[in-house]
């Protein structure tokens, strides 16, 4: 099944793309950071089309939990800030919701 890989890839691409804008506007990096950033955001959008879902909104809703987990991973691994218990508790709640959306018996 391609859905888990598509969600993880989309999360990495979205976070990297958004971070390029953050780096430019908040960290004073060159405007050229936007070139790979925009390519990364385009890859993010493409990867979400690979998700096994009949409805875009449902795919995006389920993706939200994955995005939150990936964002906390970025926080820790790239920015060097360890997520606290509130970060982790909130992420767990969202991830449970994403799993319910993914595996629930939906009507088409």
Swiss-Prot record:
Where located?
Cell inner membrane
Q: How does it sit in the membrane?
A: Multi-pass membrane protein
**Bilayer-spanning residue ranges:** 5-25, 31-51, 61-81, 88-108
Question: Any one cellular component term from GO for this entry?
Answer: plasma membrane
Supply the InterPro entries for this chain. Answer: UPF0060
**Zinc: present as a keyword of the record?**
no
A Pfam family that this protein carries is UPF0060
UniProt keywords (A-Z) are: Cell inner membrane, Cell membrane, Membrane, Transmembrane, Transmembrane helix
Q: Which family does it belong to?
A: Belongs to the UPF0060 family.
What name appears for this protein in its UniProt entry?
Answer: UPF0060 membrane protein Nwi_1459
Species of origin reads Nitrobacter winogradskyi (strain ATCC 25391 / DSM 10237 / CIP 104748 / NCIMB 11846 / Nb-255)
